[in-house]
């Protein structure tokens, strides 16, 4: 799966599982 953070897709392990990314509202897409 992927996350979208500020319009940027990141790998789950680097974004979804990252507390900073979660804090800014990253979402699975």
UniProtKB/Swiss-Prot annotation:
What does the tissue specificity note say?
Answer: Expressed by the venom gland.
Q: Which organism is it from?
A: Ctenus ornatus
Q: What is its main location?
A: secreted
- Source organism, top-level taxon: Eukaryota
Q: What keyword terms does UniProt attach to this protein?
A: Disulfide bond, Secreted
Q: What GO terms fall under cellular component here?
A: extracellular region
- SS bond list: 3-16, 10-21
Q: Hey, which family's this protein in?
A: Belongs to the neurotoxin 33 family.
- What protein does this entry describe? U20-ctenitoxin-Co1a
Query: Where does this one sit in the cell?
Result: Secreted
């Amino acid at each position: 799966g992927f996350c979208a953070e500020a319009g940027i897709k990141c790998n789950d392990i680097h974004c979804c599982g990252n507390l900073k990314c979660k804090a800014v509202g990253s979402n699975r897409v």
